[in-house]
Regions:
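Short helix-initiation/N-cap motifs at beta->coil->alpha
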Residues: 71-82, 94-97, 179-200, 210-211
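Short, polar/charged alpha-helical segment
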Residues: 46-73, 78-79, 100-105, 165-174, ...
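Short, well-ordered beta-strand elements
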Residues: 36-47, 67-72, 151-155, 185-186
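Secondary-structure end/capping motifs
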Residues: 250-327
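Pocket-lining segment of extracytoplasmic ligand-binding domains
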Residues: 190-281
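Haloarchaeal acidic low-complexity proteome signature biased toward cell-envelope/secretome components but also
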Residues: 1-36
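Ligand-binding "clamshell"
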Residues: 102-112, 172, 215-229, 286
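A conserved helix-loop-strand patch within extracytoplasmic ligand-binding domains
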Residues: 115-186, 245
Length: 346
């Protein structure tokens, strides 16, 4: 599979006083005491952009917190939003759009860390890649329709998801194309559904993150990159770490984000081991170790912690989330982010 030409990128917990911590955390899923016996519930998804969770879990970084961590795996963002609304989640590592939905619904939470930036690629069938002319995108898709008798179909995550919004931005803002006129967009049920749809040639292309592109290459499927997010949306957001206010206003916030940053540093220095951790948590049947390792070499695997690095892209996503009816208003950076936790780290 053709790869885009881009350079590959780049214990301490201060416990709060018992009474103050209990007061500040009233209403939190697991009220965090100072004796380490209580529970912090962390939602995550089995996707590469949640790599920090895999490392924190497998390297024992959660043990540095004065609270036990209960990880809950979800297949999609909307399910995490529902769990957040029910008060079942303290911290969630998932997409920026569902994080915005949580905030827009008035649930007391903010993004305290980013997990990754620019992790998306636009892939198309090899036949279309030969036709693709970025200077005449409408003509390229019309040629496909003329030769195949059908409109080009992108299959990606459901409407309003990070992959979906990135695809719409690429089509509309970058190439002045209209979904439903020049191309069709089909919402699939997640990464595995997208992969199967491509393998069965139900879709002609996709907007997707690792490890799907690497799995496509490993299985010799006829798809390749025609663009990557870094080339048209620098600082593109994806998975983030959303924290409930009851946790965010306690010392636990800094402790958690400190371990998140530590995990990001570990990933940078130990990419193969981090890949093995991802395979262990996700499951080797779904993510074989060799595929996980190869995906780490992808230009889409850009792991970060500083939330400011995705601020510009988040503004674009906020506009699209509102336009698609996922939020009632266009959220500002101030409404979405709390930079103080990261900025306060030693």
């Amino acid at each position: 599979m053709t790869r885009p030409s881009r350079e590959l990128s780049r214990r301490e917990y201060l416990a709060g006083s018992g009474a103050a911590a209990l007061t500040g955390l009233a209403g939190c899923t697991g009220v965090l005491g100072s004796d380490g016996s209580d529970t912090l519930t962390v939602a995550y998804m089995p996707i590469y952009p949640d790599m920090q969770y895999f490392v924190m879990d497998q390297e024992g970084y959660f043990d540095e917190l004065d609270a036990s961590v209960e990880g809950k795996q979800f297949t999609d963002g909307p399910s995490i939003v529902k769990a957040y609304a029910s008060g079942d989640i303290d911290v969630a590592m998932f997409g920026i759009v569902p994080a915005m939905i949580v905030v827009d619904r008035g649930i007391a939470a903010k993004v305290v860390a980013a997990n990754i930036e620019e992790p998306m690629g636009i892939l198309a069938h090899d036949r279309f890649a030969e036709m693709w002319d970025p200077n005449d995108p409408a003509g390229s898709f019309e040629q496909w329709r003329s030769e195949t008798g059908e409109r080009f179909t992108f299959g990606t995550f459901p409407e309003g998801s990070v992959p979906d919004i990135l695809l719409r931005y690429w089509l509309v803002d970058e190439h002045d194309l209209e979904p439903g006129k020049h191309v069709d967009i089909v919402g699939a049920g997640g990464a595995n559904a997208v992969f199967q749809g491509l393998a069965n040639e139900e879709f002609d292309g996709t907007s997707i993150m690792e490890p799907v592109p690497t799995k496509i290459a490993a299985n010799d499927l006829p798809y390749q990159f025609i663009d990557v997010a870094a080339d048209f949306m620098p600082g593109q957001p994806a998975a983030v770490t959303l924290m409930a206010d009851e946790v965010r206003d306690s010392d636990t916030a800094a402790a958690f984000v400190r371990q998140h940053r530590r995990a990001t540093e570990f990933i940078s220095s130990n990419r193969e081991t981090a890949a093995e951790h991802a395979s262990a948590v996700v499951g080797e049947q779904s993510l074989p170790v060799d595929v996980a390792r190869q995906a780490m070499e992808s230009p889409l695997s850009n792991f970060i912690t500083d939330p400011r690095e995705i601020e510009s892209g988040t503004k674009i996503f906020a506009e699209y989330a509102n336009r698609l009816g996922k939020t009632d208003s266009t959220l500002s950076a101030e409404q979405v982010f709390d930079y103080s936790v990261y900025d306060g780290l030693e």
